[in-house]
A protein has these predicted regions:
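RNA-binding accessory domains that recognize and position tRNA/RNA substrates
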Residues: 4-177, 181-215
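Glycine-rich beta-strand-to-loop/alpha-helix junction loops that act as flexible
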Residues: 221-224
């Protein structure tokens, strides 16, 4: 039940199913491909994983945000998912590394979060019908069928840019000069290369092979 102090929000699936809940995080509408995640831990990994770029992620675990925001757990500099859906968002996290609440983080990153919905029912629907386009809305559509049809016809850009915009020189020196085309590189991938003696230079996805060759790399990598 949405109280007078809370703002209503909605999740509309492309098949016309509408879920009403509480809008937290960034108070804005957003659309993307709806997917579900059944993991019990590691929500910071999920939020910052470039693999979820442009998607609305539904978490089945009932309470998210128990240990707050832990910057060390980030897989990328900033999250790139379109929206977040969970049953309950923890307001009082407890962790010695906690750097703030998850809601504050979502607000700062411009990510809308819908809570107070039956995420397992949503998951069953996505499991049975397959992933589909969806939207987190700030207002209930006047014509749900028309809004769903428009959503179903929408083309979600699978090439969402999640990497660096300019060439980023290696932060740490190394024996080997590795140049990585950044199409959404995970921080851990770079760190693992650095541990193995590599100085990792990141370049945007649209940088030409000639430009990469001009950096005289010992090796070249392409992020997933």
């Amino acid at each position: 039940r949405v109280t007078s102090m809370e703002k209503k929000g909605y999740l509309l699936l492309a098949d016309g199913q509408l879920y009403e809940g509480v809008l937290r995080g960034a108070e804005k509408a957003s659309s993307g491909e709806a997917v579900f995640l059944t993991s019990v831990v590691g929500y910071m990994d999920t939020l910052t994983d470039p693999a979820y770029a442009g998607q609305i992620v539904v978490q089945t675990f009932p309470q998210i945000g128990n240990y707050g925001v832990v910057p060390e757990a980030d897989l990328a500099v900033k999250p790139s998912l379109a929206g977040y859906v969970c049953r309950e968002l923890c307001d009082k996290p407890s962790n010695f590394r906690c750097g703030g609440t998850l809601e504050d983080y979502l607000t700062q990153q411009g990510i809308p979060c819908l809570t107070g919905v039956d995420t397992r029912a949503i998951t069953r629907r996505l499991r049975d019908k397959g992933v589909m386009n969806a939207a987190i809305l700030t207002e209930k559509p006047a014509d749900i069928a028309a809004a769903a049809a428009e959503l179903a016809a929408m083309t979600i850009d699978a090439e969402t840019e999640t990497g660096v915009e300019d060439i980023v020189p290696a932060e740490k020196p190394g024996k080997y000069n590795v140049v990585m085309w950044d199409m959404g590189a995970k921080a851990d991938t770079v760190q693992q290369l650095e541990k193995r003696g590599c100085a990792v230079t990141l370049v945007p996805a649209n940088v030409t092979a000639e430009a990469v060759a001009a950096l005289s790399p010992d090796g070249v990598a392409i992020s997933h």
